[in-house]
Amino acid sequence: MTTIVSVRRNNKVVIAGDGQVSLGNTVMKGNARKVRRLYNNKVLAGFAGGTADAFTLFERFESKLQMHQGHLTKAAVELAKDWRSDRALRKLEALLAVADETASLIITGNGDVVQPENDLIAIGSGGAYAQAAATALLENTDLDAREIAEKALNIAGDICVFTNHHHTVEELDSTTEPETPAA
């Protein structure tokens, strides 16, 4: 699989991912681009799961963004509806992490759209490691979003055999800050 992480901090949002493509227990490619810019570079998207499935979802998601003039949440919900109702899409095995200047969302293979706590997303085989690392860095450092995403991916890559250290990082200016959790 892979690891994708998204962090929002100090008016920046980042989605970063590793580049490993595995077939069973064999590394087939180490420099795949699993993070992309969509809709006139205003939306970031990263995928975890089957590569062909993810490209199909990228195309569908981008068409939904076009249809809804770049409205991220509306496009995500419409894609999720299609994913649930379309027999061909239902068989796709992938997760999407998407973000624009105001929102960060996870679109699941079950057709769910989730807005994560604190605008922190970590998906894929190394997602739990990346999420734990990013959470600790968000709570205990002043690092920026890009540094946190890169460090979280490095930690996931050190632990998860399906995650490597070849990263693609995309960044946008953000107009919102995640809520600080109550003590």
UniProtKB/Swiss-Prot annotation:
CDD domains named among the record's database cross-references: protease_HslV
Active site: T2
GO cellular component: HslUV protease complex; proteasome core complex
Chief localization: cytoplasm
EC code(s) of this entry: 3.4.25.2
One Pfam family here: Proteasome
Domain of life: Bacteria
UniProt note on regulation of activity: Allosterically activated by HslU binding.
Compartment(s): Cytoplasm
GO biological process: proteolysis involved in protein catabolic process
GO molecular function, one term: metal ion binding
UniProt xrefs under SUPFAM superfamilies: N-terminal nucleophile aminohydrolases (Ntn hydrolases)
Reaction(s) catalysed by this chain's protein: ATP-dependent cleavage of peptide bonds with broad specificity
Keyword entries, A-Z: Allosteric enzyme, Cytoplasm, Hydrolase, Metal-binding, Protease, Sodium, Threonine protease
Residue numbers binding Na(+): G157, C160, T163
Record text on subunit structure and interactions: A double ring-shaped homohexamer of HslV is capped on each side by a ring-shaped HslU homohexamer. The assembly of the HslU/HslV complex is dependent on binding of ATP.
HAMAP family from the UniProt entry: HslV
Chain's role: Protease subunit of a proteasome-like degradation complex believed to be a general protein degrading machinery.
Record-stated family: Belongs to the peptidase T1B family. HslV subfamily.
Entry protein name: ATP-dependent protease subunit HslV
Species this protein is from: Vibrio parahaemolyticus serotype O3:K6 (strain RIMD 2210633)
